[in-house]
Amino acid sequence: MNSMLNPNAVPCQPSPQVVAIPMQYPSGFSPGFRRQRNPGFRPMFNRRRNNNGNQNRGRQNRQRVQNNNRGNIRNRQNNGQRGNRRQYNQPSPNVPFEQQLLMMANETAYAATYPPEMQNVAPTKLVKIAKRAAMQIVSGHATVEISNGTEDSNKRVATFTIKVVMN
């Protein structure tokens, strides 16, 4: 009895308690079962996180569109169809969102009218400027007019006007 009361006398005394702990679980809820089930859930969470990233980006862009012009057709269309939002945001699921923006920016840059002072600017810079415009306007068509900014600073700033045609 004294050896059981004294923890220094028998150092191996707690080991039967450690062995007996898994018997407290019900048969269906053993920790091994939990360990087997977790890897099946991980891809679902990864997929959901990727979708949420795209949806958040689209939601931020749509908020900018809503602030720019209040009676937007796409916003009215999507109010009652929250479950099918992904189908409207991404017309082709194979093309990522940045690629769609780049394609839109290329079309916008080709449709833009440039003043003669800006003809010597590199086309990639014009596409970058048009990409900023395309990110602000996801729905509708935009033509970008680029003109030189103020001459006060030694750095020339290109300003652009976005014209939106709602249809």
UniProtKB/Swiss-Prot annotation:
Spans annotated as Disordered: 28-94
Indicate the principal place this protein occupies in or around the cell: virion
Please report, in chain numbering, the residue ranges of the motif Nuclear export signal.
153-162
Keyword list (alphabetical) reads: Host nucleus, Ribonucleoprotein, RNA-binding, Viral nucleoprotein, Virion
**Stretches with biased composition (Low complexity):** 51-90
From which residue to which does the signal peptide run? none
Q: Does the keyword Ribonucleoprotein apply?
A: yes
Under InterPro entries, the record lists: Torovirus_nucleocapsid
**Gene Ontology MF: a single term:** RNA binding
The cellular location(s) given in this protein's UniProt record come to: Virion; Host nucleus, Host nucleoplasm; Host nucleus, Host nucleolus
Where are the stretches annotated involved in nuclear and nucleolar localization? 31-62
Q: Name one GO cellular component term.
A: host cell nucleolus
Q: Which family does the record claim for this protein?
A: Belongs to the torovirinae nucleoprotein family.
Explain the purpose of this protein: Major structural component of virions that associates with genomic RNA.
Q: What is this protein called?
A: Nucleoprotein
* Organism field: Breda virus 1
